[in-house]
Curated annotation (Swiss-Prot):
The protein, known as: Secreted RxLR effector protein 105
Domain notes: The RxLR-dEER motif acts to carry the protein into the host cell cytoplasm through binding to cell surface phosphatidylinositol-3-phosphate.
UniProt signal peptide: 1-21
Function (record text): Secreted effector that dos not suppress the host cell death induced by cell death-inducing proteins.
Keywords: Host cytoplasm, Host nucleus, Secreted, Signal, Virulence
Subcellular location: Secreted; Host nucleus; Host cytoplasm
A single GO cellular-component term on record: host cell nucleus
Sequence motif RxLR-dEER, location on chain: 48-63
Length: 522
């Protein structure tokens, strides 16, 4: 019985393979292995039969056939898991076969090639204007997401709209259209590379312009010895942005210690000067940073947080500007290099302001000791050049805190438009630098209504940006300021309400409030 059973089993295996072949969805792995084993066995089979029959007639025939079938069955059993998995997928294959007529019908409804080619943009002209792929591949790197249309984006959108429009007409397929498809795909890939190349070139031009205009001051060397804070002689590159806003959630100021927080904030404002006007929340963030227990490198960690705060303010400024369609459209009409230049410069201005506030608070610690009056350190409201220079000279001679920064800002008028010229000398913690806006006129008339949106206070007050806004999500813990040595028996008071930098420009003396007024945001 073993012989017939083995033969029947082999026939069943062969029959199942033929059935799978008829459905045009063969069990490839199983069929391949069975075929290989069968070929290997059938080849030496005549020799085995003859060797067995030489000694005893018909003595080894049954055993030879059985051994061959047994090896085939064992090999098939080892492959059964793969076969079972393939069998499970057979219903899906049958369903796909049923949908083949629909696929064929969809192919017949594709647009005509002639009409699509007629409505395509001038591919040859676009390719001639695009840089070579090799140069683009070398220079393309990680670029910032700007959310605006790049060069040649209009052509790509026109192609897609043409395809959608012609696809709706359900016209038959043309052979020449199929031939043109690879060329269209290649042209689209070249356009994508051109966009990345143009974006990279614009950011590089913005970085070069900033490096030319942002020079360190070597004539006013270190004052007071070694540095005791974060150096301000640093240029942040727009290309190296890392949008990691962990811990950038809005800060909460405890209202139950108003009588303690208020004098600390007032003392800190006197130390910084009127033109910086740090808010209570900004002071809270700096105070909490100084109290963090960072074992490795606290200043490096603090610097990274100040960079993140500067990035956050730039993005919030863009978000506020986007709320006004007129201003946003005017902003998008500017060239990419000019837009990146403005964002790059604003990023460094915000960072400089945060570094100054951090170093001042770290040096004097108004939360832990009394701070003397510093009314002579007022740096705000100076629009006249002579008054600014006089203030600078006076501060050099009689400044109570010689390490404090002294800023001068004015606006000069020319026939072609308004050119903002800013000079700032910062001599705190032994680090000095001088920042000046490039003298090159970069369409400042167009930038005039845009700059207030980007430079206004975005930390608190009526014009703050909610963290629930999907465009700006800052995850992380909520900061809270609780002064030291506070008794639990102290009575609770209403939440602390403080005056922010309101709607006027205040970037550490970079823009003066009497020369530029920020428009009201609805």
């Amino acid at each position: 019985m073993r012989g017939p059973c083995s033969v029947i089993t082999a026939l069943l295996v062969v029959a199942s393979s033929q059935i799978a072949a008829e459905s045009d969805y063969r069990l490839q792995a199983y069929h391949h292995d069975v075929t290989a084993v069968g070929n290997a066995v059938v080849k030496p089979l005549p020799k085995r039969y003859l060797r067995g029959s030489q000694h005893v007639l018909d003595s080894n025939e049954e055993r030879s056939v059985y051994s061959v079938l047994a090896s085939m069955i064992n090999e098939g059993v080892s492959k059964m898991p793969q076969a079972a998995e393939a069998v499970e997928k057979m219903p899906q294959a049958a369903e796909a076969v049923e949908k083949m007529p629909q696929a064929a019908e969809a192919v017949e409804k594709m647009p005509q090639a002639a009409e699509a080619v007629e409505k395509m943009p001038q591919a040859a002209e676009a390719v001639e204007k695009m840089p070579s792929a090799a140069m683009a591949g070398k220079k393309v790197s990680r670029v910032t997401k700007t959310g605006k249309k790049m060069p040649h984006a209009a052509e790509i959108e026109a192609v897609e709209e043409t395809l959608h429009a012609t696809n709706a007409r359900k016209e038959p397929l043309r052979a020449d259209f199929v031939e043109e498809m690879p060329h269209a795909a290649k042209a689209k890939e070249e356009m994508r590379r051109a966009k990345q190349h143009d974006l990279l070139r614009a950011t590089e031009e913005a970085d070069e312009a900033l490096e030319k205009s942002w020079h360190s001051s070597e004539d006013t060397a270190a004052i007071g010895g070694a540095s005791r804070g974060i150096s301000s002689n640093v240029i942040l590159s727009l290309k190296k942005w890392k949008n990691n806003f962990q811990g950038m959630r809005a800060m909460a100021v405890s209202g139950e210690h108003e009588d303690i927080i208020k004098p600390i904030h007032e003392a800190f404002v006197r130390l910084c000067g009127e033109n910086m006007e740090p808010t209570t929340k900004e002071m809270t963030l700096i105070r909490n940073m100084l109290d963090w227990d960072v074992a490795a490198s606290p200043e490096s960690s603090h610097r990274q947080n100040l960079v993140s705060q500067a990035q956050r303010h730039v993005l919030i400024g863009l978000r506020i500007m986007q709320r006004d369609p007129e201003v946003w459209n005017e902003w998008n009409e500017l060239s990419e290099s000019l837009r990146f230049g403005v964002l790059d410069y604003l990023l460094n201005l915000h960072y400089q302001r945060w570094v100054r506030m951090y170093n001042i608070f770290k040096r004097h610690r108004p939360d832990k000791k009394d701070v003397p009056m510093n009314d002579k350190l007022s740096l705000g409201g100076n629009t006249d050049k002579n008054s600014a220079l006089a203030l600078q000279t006076h501060s050099k001679k009689q400044n109570l805190y010689p390490d404090e920064p002294s800023n001068v800002a004015w606006t000069s008028k020319k026939r072609d438009g308004s050119v903002l010229i800013e000079r700032s000398k910062r001599t705190f913690n032994g680090n000095t630098d001088t920042a000046s806006v490039p003298y090159k006129q970069l369409k400042m008339q167009s930038l005039k209504p845009v700059m207030p949106f980007l430079t206004r206070s975005t930390t608190s007050g009526h014009h703050s940006v909610s963290i629930k806004n999907p465009g700006l999500s800052f995850d992380g813990p909520i900061f809270a300021f609780v002064p030291p040595n506070v008794h639990k028996s102290q009575s609770l008071t209403p939440p602390l309400v403080h005056k922010d930098v309101d709607t006027e420009l205040s970037l550490g003396g970079i823009y003066d409030r009497s020369t530029h007024k920020a428009p009201t945001v609805p």
